[in-house]
Amino acid sequence: MSKIGLVLEGGGMKCAYTAGILDAMMDNGVTFDYCIGVSAGSANGVSFVAGQRGRNIRFYTEHINEKGYFGLSSFLKTGNLFGLQYIYGTLTNSGGADPLDFDAFMKSPMEYWLVATDAQTGKPTYFSKKDMHKDDYRHVMASCAIPAACRPVEIDGRFYYDGGVSDSIPVQDRKSVV
């Protein structure tokens, strides 16, 4: 039997629009068998799978104005124009200002995948929610780490960049991961 999936592309602020659509889907009980995200779409997907209505849009409308989120201050402190550790660590971890409901994310029957680009090979790597751990969101960081604007993110001894570099709309290879 075929599975029905949701593919969430990246694109930074374009994903603010997607965040509103995802909230409308949650309001109307729309679900999928799986969700696969790339770049900022991977972050939107995590909140959608967890059922956290409103969480995504807060990152694009409220948190974006915070000092550690984006800009010269973040770049000078971390080497990243986007404060990936601030966004997916300080804000997202259990004690953060806008924590991911990791238990709901893991318990959701919806499968979840994200794409990151292997910095050495340039090939896409697909991670599932089974690869993720509470308060360790390096997989999402990796999927969002834009080359030249961010340093690569290390996971298990390998370095990764934004998944959009190698598979910007992960439709063709979805059969290999689902």
Q: Where do the model's predicted regions map?
A:
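Patatin-like phospholipase
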Residues: M1-V38, V46-V178
